[in-house]
Amino acid sequence: MGRRPWQGVKYMSVIKELLSELALKIKYYNPSDYPHLKDGMKFNIRGTAYIFIDIFNSEKVTQNILLHEIGHVSFGHRHLDCRSSGWDRRQEREADRYMIQHRADEWLAQFDWEPDVIDYDKFIEYFELEKRHYGLVVEVFDEIIGQPQLHSHCL
């Protein structure tokens, strides 16, 4: 497992700061060498918490995974074998929301003023999010801006 430098990614410094505050370290892995690992898996090894990331991910996907996992930690989520699938979905949604909120803040920071319309499809494509996040993206932007936006596909 090797390390990968973060060249030219200014937002990564925010993520690294959050990881440091939460005492989390990143470990990169090659899935062909470690087929049992999955992106974003968190393990404690000798008292240090590691998040495992596939070396073939793009930088944006890696950042999304890290923000999602930081969301789990910041919400105090714990892995319990006996928890219900409803509890699991709730925790995943909270972690996804955390990641999308950070991405929405980053997206809105590019504008000098609040945009009249948010192009959700463009946002999802830019940050390489999965289409399943569309509804949550809409919710997050509606909360941030304080009013429902026209959906970009309605324009």
Q: Which role does the model predict for each range below?
A:
Residues M1-L155:
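Active-site hotspot residues in diverse enzymes, especially metal/ion-binding acidic/histidine motifs
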